[in-house]
Amino acid sequence: MGYGNRASSKTPAISGLREKHQQDLEKLTLTSQPFKTLRLFVVAVFLYVRRWSSYLLANVGWLILFCSIFVAFAALLVTLDGPHVKHVEELSEYTRFGLWWIFLGVASSIGLGSGLHTFVLYLGPHIALFTIKVMQCGRVDLKSAIYDTIQLKRSPSWLDKPCHEFGSPVFSSGVPLSSILPQVQIEAILWGLGTALGELPPYFISRAASLSGGKMKELETCSGDDNGFIAKRVNQIKSWLLSHSQYLNFFTILILASVPNPLFDLAGIMCGQFEKPFWEFFLATLIGKAIIKTHIQTVFIICVCNNQLLDWVENELIYILSFVPGFASALPELTAKLRLMKEKYLIASPPVSSDINVKKWDLSFASVWNGVVWLMLLNFFGQIVTSTAQRYLKKQQEEELDALTNKSSLTSKKSK
């Protein structure tokens, strides 16, 4: 009797503690508990840095030595004058260009969909602005170098330069897609490479959880109830994918990575959970995201900003409206208005006399755009701080639960 009462009292105690832990996790945010969240975040980062520093010093000391020698050699090249300086500066520009676009790709794919949407913020506008400038100037050789793109706190040199400084137009009517695509292809592929690299952390974390006999939280919660028609349908599709995820292979991963969709967030977790080979997952993700998906998005942006698409829309509208009674007589006037709007939109840069007003408008637009970017950065940083603090708190809660469970087990054994 005594043992039965103790056993029955053990379960409510653990269940109550779990409910309390869940409530504490939900309350731990920067808005509700900012000081506690920041404190746990700082502690978690400190422990993470200390653990990895100890690991690096103990296991890969040769790598640290090599990196130190490389950094010292690079610093020596930068500080010393000579004919090598221009080559070092050029190499620095290429390195900054590559790291910038790869970093934007990583920032876009990490966080299981909550990352920065850098295609909308940077790559998409860059391709659109370059295409519009190409259509205005009638030539594609606008860049001073491959790295002459949008970067942090730096605009490309061709953006505000008038078309007459580039020379006379090479293309009279329209610039073909095959000529525009190579000019923006490298930065697009680098961005796609970053998105593929951003899918690796979920894969490794899920694989480690699978090898230890655990299960990722994202796989457990994706089948939960969600309000809203779209959320329910997306969760149904995710549940279907999970039920068939043991059949994942190179081609299914490639298809999921190639098509822009919100479902690939779980691909890395599923492949890690079912212990798919790393190179099979990474190569399929790399080809799908850095080659196929990137080119689909880039070609779409170029076509939208290219007047060839406007010509096609105009011709299709004229063809369709010609069959509508009453519109045949109004088609010439409508066509003239459409062409006037297109020429006004794609006309070359205005004279220098009105350049001051344009720069003022550009400055205000840039200020608003930078404000939006900084707000998204702050939101992204807040999500990182909150998730890190919650993960650290959950680890402490699991240790507390394990201690309580072990204590209850010892008490039960003694009562026998």
Swiss-Prot record:
Residues 81-100, 271-281, 337-364 are lumenal. The lineage of its organism: Eukaryota, Viridiplantae, Streptophyta, Embryophyta, Tracheophyta. One of its GO terms (biological process) is endomembrane system organization. Involved in the early secretory pathway. Required for the correct export of secretory products from the endoplasmic reticulum (ER) and involved in the maintenance of ER integrity. GO terms for cellular component: endoplasmic reticulum; endoplasmic reticulum membrane. This is Vacuole membrane protein KMS2. The keyword ATP-binding does not apply. It comes from Arabidopsis thaliana (Mouse-ear cress). It is found in: Endoplasmic reticulum membrane. The chain crosses the membrane at residues 60-80, 101-123, 250-270, 282-304, 316-336, 365-385. The modification N-acetylglycine is found at G2. Belongs to the VMP1 family. The keyword Transmembrane helix applies. Residues 2-59, 124-249, 305-315, 386-416 are cytoplasmic.
